[in-house]
Design a protein with these regions (language model features):
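Multi-pass alpha-helical transporter architecture, strongest
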Residues: 55-63, 150-181
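Loop-to-transmembrane helix entry/capping segments in MFS-fold secondary transporters
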Residues: 4-5, 99-109
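A membrane-interface helix-boundary motif in multi-pass transporters
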Residues: 39-45, 126-159
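C-terminal transmembrane helical hairpin of 12-TM major facilitator-type secondary transporters
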Residues: 40-89
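Transmembrane alpha-helical cores of Major Facilitator Superfamily
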Residues: 12-19, 76, 107-115
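Paired intracellular helix-loop junctions of major facilitator superfamily
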Residues: 33-34, 93-102
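Transmembrane alpha-helices of Major Facilitator/SLC transporters
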Residues: 7-33, 50
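Interfacial helix-cap and linker-helix signal at transmembrane-aqueous boundaries
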Residues: 27-28, 32, 123-133
Length: 181
């Protein structure tokens, strides 16, 4: 909608994303320069912090029943966490791989992200249609119908980054640059 409140909500959401995502790029540098951590540990600690931001998404829908400002603020924090996570994830490629492979590795990662995005969006759309058709017969965590579908998606997104961080930590438990011969 083009109402003044809707415009203010969207502005607030994007302002939060913009300001905090810039800070998200700085946090690993702070850990390295000010706390003396090695770059890998600093980046992984920052990524763990950003992976926790989406947990706030579990509150967006319930808090929306109190005021529309809460979801705007919470989703702004989620977006900032996502941006900071992504920036640091892509930076790990430059940290670990030789310059001659960075573009290829980044492209493979971006393609995987695009396919994952397509699948989550397609699955969400099917879930929303199903939930809407079932109406009150479809219930999840106190929400019925389509709102229950949205709550399911918020739950999936809330844990996806933590799962991703754990997978990355399992695949790369210690920093070791990859050498291509």
């Amino acid at each position: 909608s083009d109402s003044p409140q809707a415009i203010a909500l969207i502005f607030t959401l994007y302002a939060i994303v913009t300001v905090l995502s810039i800070f998200g790029g700085y946090l690993p540098t702070y850990f390295v320069d000010k706390l003396g951590m090695n770059p890998y540990l600093g980046r992984m600690r920052a990524m763990l912090i950003f992976a926790c931001f989406p947990l706030l998404g579990l509150l967006a829908q319930p808090m929306g029943q109190i005021s529309p400002w809460w979801p705007a603020i919470i989703i702004g924090l989620l977006g900032a966490g996502h941006q900071a996570w992504s920036a640091n994830l892509y930076s790990t490629i430059g940290d670990m791989f030789p310059k001659s492979t960075i573009a290829t590795i980044t492209g493979i990662g971006a393609m995987a992200g695009g396919v994952g995005s397509f699948l989550i969006n397609k699955g969400s759309g099917l879930l929303f249609t199903y939930a809407e058709n079932k109406g009150d017969a479809f219930s999840f965590m106190g929400f019925d119908g389509k709102p229950a579908g949205y709550m399911i998606v918020f739950c999936i997104c809330a844990v996806a980054y933590l799962i991703g961080w754990c997978i990355m930590k399992m695949l790369v438990p210690k920093y070791k640059p990859i050498v291509v011969e």
